[in-house]
Regions:
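Aliphatic-rich helix starts adjacent to a transmembrane/signal segment
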Residues: 33-53, 63
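Alpha-helix exit/C-cap motif
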Residues: 54-74
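Short, low-complexity, Pro/Ser/Thr/Gly-rich segments in the mature regions of secreted, periplasmic
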Residues: 138-156
């Protein structure tokens, strides 16, 4: 009996109980963490789009002031037009060869030459597409996440 009392440490049952409790806690935390990860990814593409919107509006306003603004249609990639290339460089989303970086697959700008305003920007980054609409999103039901004039949906 004395030998049993002098033994220190945990019994096998105590260790198993602790492991079961840790497994239950981990199972409860995993769904919450994936929600945070998704929200962080949404915010990342929104931040990229905000940067593109600011850069595009800066370049477009400058062209409008010089009288060289042309209508931008969302059918062409931004890195193929002069204003788009300048905006992409300013937003730091292209390399020196005008190729997209940081998992950006597509950037499309829409602007009106009559008033020099960028009206719509669409950025595809990773698995998500973020859309900016100057006058607010026309429909918020299409998006998994919205923030002001920005909406994020899954890329197809």
């Amino acid at each position: 009996i004395r030998k049993m009392k002098n033994k220190k440490g945990f019994t096998l049952v105590e260790l198993i109980v602790v492991l079961v409790i840790l497994a239950i806690l981990a199972a409860l935390l995993v769904p919450a963490l994936t929600g945070y990860i998704d929200k962080a990814n949404y915010e990342k593409v929104v931040a990229t789009t905000r940067s593109v919107v600011m850069a595009a509006q800066t370049e477009y306003s400058e062209a409008y002031g010089k009288g060289t603004a042309v209508a931008l249609a969302a059918t062409a990639e931004a890195n193929t037009t002069d204003i788009g290339k300048a905006a992409c460089k300013l937003a730091e989303i292209t390399d020196s060869a005008d190729k997209y970086i940081n998992d950006i697959k597509s950037v499309k700008l829409t602007g009106t030459a009559t008033d020099g305003v960028i009206t719509k920007v669409e950025v595809t980054q990773g698995k998500y597409i973020c859309v900016y609409e100057k006058n607010g999103l026309t429909s918020t039901t299409d998006y998994k996440y919205t923030s002001g004039n920005y909406g994020v949906k899954a890329a197809s």
